[in-house]
Design a protein with these regions (language model features):
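N-terminal interaction/assembly modules
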Residues: 1-155
Length: 155
């Protein structure tokens, strides 16, 4: 990995942890971002601006992001049933898929499946891969050589 990709990976991992903290303990994006930057950054390279864009973007677009995630889950799963760290992973990835067209969909999927592997040893990374692949094919159909579905225009 290059320094830039390491820094982006660090930002994604920190954003997932911060989103998890926000969901469990409360607190706004700005407050949590300040805490992470002051106390948790430094050990690994982290792109602070990228981190903040994810951390601020998810709450700002949460209802539409959650709708996009729910549409990619199987009928037997609801977003509320998904483990809270998996929810944070899916939300951060969904934000990138809908708001960061400069990042290829396959990179987003690979990065967040990798992050899922950092937290889980079981089937969860496969779950993340399947959900994000479905979402990417709907939201970024052109990148996969697919016809553009109507819901790609939802965001």
């Amino acid at each position: 990995m290059s320094h830039d990709s390491d820094a982006r990976h660090g930002a994604r991992l920190a954003a997932v942890q911060a989103l998890y903290q926000m969901e469990l303990a409360g607190g706004g994006a700005e407050e949590v971002a300040e805490e992470f930057i002051a106390h948790r950054f430094g050990e690994t390279p982290t792109d602070e601006d990228f981190f903040k864009s994810i951390l601020e973007g998810v709450p700002a677009r949460q209802s539409e992001i959650d709708k996009a995630i729910a549409a990619c889950l199987t009928e037997s799963w609801t977003l509320a049933r998904v483990d809270s760290i998996l929810r944070a992973i899916l939300r951060a990835a969904a934000l990138e898929l809908v708001a960061r067209r400069d990042v290829p969909a396959r990179v987003v999927i690979d990065e967040y499946v990798g992050i899922a592997h950092e937290f889980f040893a079981g089937d969860e990374p496969g779950f993340v891969n399947a959900a994000l692949d479905r979402m990417a094919r709907r939201k970024r159909a052109k990148e996969f050589g697919l016809p553009t579905p109507d819901d790609e225009l939802d965001f």
